[in-house]
């Protein structure tokens, strides 16, 4: 039995799919990780975003980040399953080493949470409308 290591997986799902299909694909991603010995610790579904460049003629993708513990021998099966899933445009699995985790904790400690650009533009519009009324 190998020691389970901490990994982070970023998945970009075809943003042109319906919400139900995206949710079903996320369930498939979770199931593939679990079937290959992975214990999911955290899932962050970012949502639909415009990609920097088209992938397979798709310009919008639904992003998700998954932290899981798993054996290194199971990664090949996970990658193969993701590669053959037509709804997954791109994926990346990274081993989270100790120095990287320490750096992440420091960043979280000293950083301020900033919303998405869409949230900021709505807040700016609200502030401008309040200022205009005064």
Swiss-Prot record:
CDD domains: bS6
UniProt entry keywords in alphabetical sequence: Ribonucleoprotein, Ribosomal protein, RNA-binding, rRNA-binding
InterPro entries per record: Ribosomal_bS6, Ribosomal_bS6_sf, Ribosomal_S6_plastid/chlpt, Transl_elong_EF1B/ribsomal_bS6
Superkingdom field: Bacteria
Single Gene Ontology BP annotation: translation
GO cellular component: ribonucleoprotein complex; ribosome
Gene Ontology MF terms in the entry: rRNA binding; structural constituent of ribosome
Family (UniProt): Belongs to the bacterial ribosomal protein bS6 family.
Cited function: Binds together with bS18 to 16S ribosomal RNA.
Record protein name field: Small ribosomal subunit protein bS6
Originating species: Chlorobium phaeobacteroides (strain BS1)
Native organism taxonomy: Bacteria, Pseudomonadati, Chlorobiota, Chlorobiia, Chlorobiales
Gene: rpsF
